[in-house]
Structure formats: C-alpha cells, structure tokens
From Swiss-Prot:
This is Protein yippee-like 2. Zn(2+) binds at residues 23, 26, 79, 82. PROSITE patterns: YIPPEE (PS51792). May interact with FAM168B. Belongs to the yippee family. Widely expressed. Detected in fetal and adult kidney, heart, liver, lung and skeletal muscle. Pfam families: Yippee-Mis18 (PF03226). Residues 19-116 form the Yippee domain. It is found in: Nucleus, Nucleolus. GO terms for molecular function: metal ion binding. GO terms for cellular component: nucleolus. It comes from Homo sapiens (Human). InterPro entries: Yippee, Yippee/Mis18/Cereblon, Yippee_fam.
Amino acid sequence: MVKMTRSKTFQAYLPSCHRTYSCIHCRAHLANHDELISKSFQGSQGRAYLFNSVVNVGCGPAEERVLLTGLHAVADIYCENCKTTLGWKYEHAFESSQKYKEGKYIIELAHMIKDNGWD
C-alpha cells in the first residue's frame, strides 16, 4: 500500500519595509514594487501590471494564445495560498518586438492590493 501525503506549501514573505502587492483574496504576498515593469497591460478582466518576478505563485501548463500584441505561449498563474487565478506568465513571444515579455508575469489589478509602505 502506498501512503499519499500532501506536500506543504511554504509561503514567502516580502520585507515589510518595501511596498508590496498582495492577493486581494487571501493577502499572500505576490510581488515587490521594485519588480514592477509596466502598468500599461490589459488582462482578461481589465487592467494588469507586468512584473519581472513574483512569489507565492503557481504556474499551469503553457498554451498558445492570441493576445492584443500577437501570438504568445502563456501559462496561467495562480495564488499558491488560495488558488485564485491571477493572470499569466509569458513563456514565449513569437514576434521579436515582444521578446522582452518572456519569463515575465501579468497580474490583473482585480486580484491584487497594495500592501506595506504606501502611505
């Protein structure tokens, strides 16, 4: 008999002295403001931000999608804590002008809030 155990996910916490973005649903930290690349993106549910790196985020399988800027291979990303879909990760850009997005993350504003040090 094989005993199945569920692996525990350890949550990353960003330094409290930095401005951060958190999941609006469970308040898990998602990104440091210093990792923000652009506020000029569109997600499937409205405005979105492009980040260089994120934490506490899982990644689904990549698939090809035609987005506003052309064909990309993207993978949906979700909060590791509450499993809410947050946006996507750019795995591959087919047009040379879009290559800068590869390996970067889109998080929709509808799923995140500002945390720590925004006063």
